[in-house]
């Protein structure tokens, strides 16, 4: 998977400790408004749901535009039942997967958003798996 440009905005926050003075590894997004990076990020998120090679064909088979197909069948929508929850869960999982893969150099399989039982339903089970070969 290509490294999305927004990953350059992820920075480590030093000096964060838990109540027992145990240091925590924390990260934050330190961003500046850049429409090109935001567009790249949006495309990166969309690719978590449906690969480019399938998108146009699936839309055509359903007699929909790509945008209509994404809204009706793929991307959780904020105005639908459970849509906001699914969107929030998905973006969190994608952000953490990106952190593990592109910042911490782990291998992260990307398949959780593919072939879901419904666009507004998160699949239950393991959210993120990350591993590293030594």
Roles of regions detected by a PLM:
Residues 1-124, 129-134:
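Mixed-charge (Asp/Glu-Lys/Arg
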